[in-house]
Amino acid sequence: MADLAKIVEELSALTVLEAAELSKMLEEKWGVSAAAPVAVAAAAAGGAAAAPAEEQTEFTVVLADAGDKKINVIKEVRGITGLGLKEAKDLVEGAPKTVKEGASKDEAAKIKKALEDAGAKVEVK
């Protein structure tokens, strides 16, 4: 039982990027996909997908370009995502990159404004 507690502690210490990488590695190792249950649930809902005129409720905020003030943009990215300094720097320098997925319209607008105020070029999809 102590081994399980140790694993929980180690997993809790992972950054978001490290957790995503771990997920990908486990998917490959076990031959499964973490997205499959979501696709099945969406297919079961069925009727919701049949109405194409619905308004978009989830948005993706993409950092298109960091601009000249990279340090300010890195600070904003850290505040928005909770990433560490190195991960935020890598995200900013690797633009275009997704900063936030599944954001509400208001949240996406706030993130876009904050990043643009810091000097970045941002797209909301």
From Swiss-Prot:
GO molecular function, one term: mRNA binding
Pfam families, alphabetized: Ribosomal_L12, Ribosomal_L12_N
GO CC terms in record: cytosolic large ribosomal subunit
Biological processes annotated in GO: translation
Alphabetic keyword roster: Ribonucleoprotein, Ribosomal protein
The keyword Chloroplast is assigned to this record: no
Top-rank taxon: Bacteria
Database matches in SUPFAM superfamilies: ClpS-like, Ribosomal protein L7/12, oligomerisation (N-terminal) domain
Family, as annotated: Belongs to the bacterial ribosomal protein bL12 family.
Self-association and partners: Homodimer. Part of the ribosomal stalk of the 50S ribosomal subunit. Forms a multimeric L10(L12)X complex, where L10 forms an elongated spine to which 2 to 4 L12 dimers bind in a sequential fashion. Binds GTP-bound translation factors.
Role of this protein: Forms part of the ribosomal stalk which helps the ribosome interact with GTP-bound translation factors. Is thus essential for accurate translation.
Protein name: Large ribosomal subunit protein bL12
Lineage, broadest ranks: Bacteria, Pseudomonadati, Pseudomonadota, Alphaproteobacteria, Acetobacterales
Gene this protein is translated from: rplL
